[in-house]
Amino acid sequence: MSAPDSNSGHAHDSAQNEGAAEGTRDPFGIDRLSVDYDYLLYRIQDHVTSIQLSTTEICRQQNQLVEQGIIGDAIDINIEEMRRILQKCEELETHFDMLDQIDSIVQTFRPRLDDIVREHRELTRNTERRI
């Protein structure tokens, strides 16, 4: 069997001694917590910067499309289509108003027709009695 490497044994011992010394210097792990906190802030800042760059690129692309007229044409087409739909809605509303007026007229005809039918029956009875 080979003898253990004297250097590796000492390195292991010194790491243990350093960890133990650190534990006595920072028993609550405040130093480690501070390092972790700083790293977390760095990662958050990195993520925010990444989002900012992506957003800036998307805005640049959209602006370029608007400048090229691609989106402008689509918007104009959509606006024109909406105007046509609104015009059809107004026409439908006019037709519904007409139907309401016709319904009102029909409602006034019913009592008048009932009166005419009643008068006709009376006249028919009176005419039959005379004959």
Curated annotation (Swiss-Prot):
Its main location: cytoplasm. GO terms for cellular component: BLOC-1 complex; cytoplasm. InterPro entries: CNL1. Signal peptide: none annotated. Residues 1-29 are annotated as: Disordered. It comes from the Eukaryota. The keyword Kinase does not apply. Residues 73-101 form a coiled coil. One of its GO terms (biological process) is endosome organization. The keyword Cytoplasm applies. Keywords: Coiled coil, Cytoplasm, Transport. It is found in: Cytoplasm. Component of the biogenesis of lysosome-related organelles complex-1 (BLOC-1), a complex that is involved in endosomal cargo sorting. Component of the biogenesis of lysosome-related organelles complex-1 (BLOC-1). Belongs to the BLOC1S4 family. This is Biogenesis of lysosome-related organelles complex 1 subunit CNL1. The gene is CLN1.
